[in-house]
Amino acid sequence: MALEKELVTLTKKWFIDRDLEHGGRLDKQALKLSEEFGELCAGYLKQNEKLTKDSIGDCAVVIVGLALLIKEDVHSIFEESDNIRRKDAMDCFKLLNANISEFQLSQELASKEMCRHNLVRAVAYLKSISKALNYDFTDCFELAYNEIKERKGRWVEGSFVKEEDLPNE
């Protein structure tokens, strides 16, 4: 649990250091979460443990950014997620998909509290998927953080693009 808190803090700092508040857009970051969820589904379906673990962590990283964009306490979102548990991986995939979609649909229509609720549940389902697959959620999160911690790039129309993916200018 201490490592998870540290990873949340480090990931928050990563986003802040890259000026998420002025460069990031909620709609684009929500779409990024869908992209990472798609990779998680692909990893699971192909029984690719490395991709699955990496994608669980990548989803957690994006959720930190989303929480910052809606100006919510990221630590409390991750802590509250421990109160929700499911056992069946497929149920968790369905529920996570629904939560991501609901977040995207409600970001302009619903209250900030509803957006926060969807993030809490998304983290909970990621943790439940990890447990169902006999992975350690914190290990997955750490794997993803270690991959991005030195990453350079810039915000392009609200989405962070890593340096190697930027078009030649």
List where the protein language model places each region.
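Flexible "arm" and connector segments at domain edges
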Residues: M1-E169
